[in-house]
Design a protein with these regions (language model features):
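Bacterial N-terminal signal peptides
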Residues: 1-5
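Thiol/disulfide oxidoreductase modules built on the thioredoxin-like
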Residues: 41-42, 93-101, 108-151
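Hydrophobic beta-strand anchors of alpha/beta hydrolase catalytic cores
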Residues: 46-47, 77, 124
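N-terminal "domain-start" segment that seeds a small globular fold
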Residues: 7-37
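Structural microenvironment flanking redox-active thiols in thiol-disulfide oxidoreductases
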Residues: 58-98, 108-115, 146
């Protein structure tokens, strides 16, 4: 039996700016379950929904890595790997190889992708300290520094 569920408010780019960031169960790369809501409301958060095979994500990577260093201790960065043609092990090897120092999670069931109405990989959501979405963007050419500033 299918149960209808209300979807969060969204625009063509996913969730609408101004809405409260939802939680969703994902897992760490070593298999522990974690809810995205555990990152929300404790300070600004940048969520990136990405994949190893995503060329736009690869284009965003240097910008994300620079911001992770620049805003260390001020902004939490969370990379949410989608499960399409991926595995936690492959994602872990990639994150290690490229020196990721921020949180990397795996969306095993697609719960986070659904909760955030992710239109495609390279989708970035910036959430302010109060848990409100202040930016959403898609593609390899995003002005992430300005987006992070909106979350501070």
């Amino acid at each position: 039996m299918m149960v209808a569920r209300a979807l969060p408010a969204q625009d063509p780019m996913g969730l609408a700016v101004g809405t409260k960031a939802p939680g969703a169960m994902v897992q760490t790369l070593d298999g522990k379950r974690v809810d995205l809501s555990s990152f929300i409301g404790k300070g600004p958060v940048v969520l990136e929904f990405w994949a190893l095979w995503c060329s736009n994500c690869k284009e965003l990577e240097p910008q994300i890595q620079t911001l992770v260093k620049k805003y260390a201790g001020k902004v939490q960065f969370v990379a949410v790997a989608v499960s399409v043609n991926e595995s936690p092990d492959r994602v872990h090897r990639y994150a290690t190889k490229y020196g990721y120092t921020h949180q990397v999670l795996f969306d095993v069931t697609g719960a986070a992708t659904d909760a955030y109405a992710v239109p495609a990989t390279s989708y970035v959501v910036v959430v302010d300290r109060g848990g409100k979405i202040v930016y959403t963007g898609l593609g390899g050419d995003q002005q992430l520094e300005a987006a992070v500033q909106k979350g501070l």
